[in-house]
C-alpha cells in the first residue's frame, strides 16, 4: 500500500488526472491512498485543521475497512513538492508505519513553504505568529536530528528531483545533510522541471522501487 501525498498546487485527484498512476499501481498490484490536505504542509495547523493527525487517521481507517497488510514492509509513502515534504516528515516521525519513502521534487527547507506566495495560500494559518520555523516540528532538518537522537530504524529513502527544478539545489543540500548524519539514501536526479510530466515518470520509478528493491 502506498500513501501518496499531493503538492501545494494539487489535490487528491491530481495524480488520477495528470499521471498514469492507476496503470502503474495495477501493474505492481499496489493499493494507493490519496488523501486531500489542502495547503496545510501536512501539519497540524495553528489556524485550521489538524492535517498531520488526519493523514494518520486515514492510514489506519483505510487499513481497517480494506484487506490491506499492516506490516511495515508492505507499506510505503511518496509525494511531490509539498507532498514530498510531507513524505519526509512522516518518514522521520512515523517510521514504524513505512518501510520505504520516496520524496519527489520535495521541499526540504520548510521555510520555502512559509515564504511562498500562492493564490489562497496563507502560511500563517500553518505557523501562527511564527515566521521562522527553524528548530520546530515543521523543520525537516530538526526532524532528522530528532530521529537520529532516537536511534530509530528509518524507512529506506529514494529521493528524486529534476535537474531543471527550482528545488534542485534544495535537494542537494538536504542529501548532504543526510550523508553527514549517516542516514542511507538513494538519490536519482534526471532531466525535468517542477511539473506532472516529470512526476508521471518519477512516481512510476518510485512504485517499481517499492516492490522490486
Q: Model-predicted segments: where are they?
A:
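Non-catalytic cap/lid and distal C-terminal segments of serine-dependent acyl enzymes
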Residues: 1-213
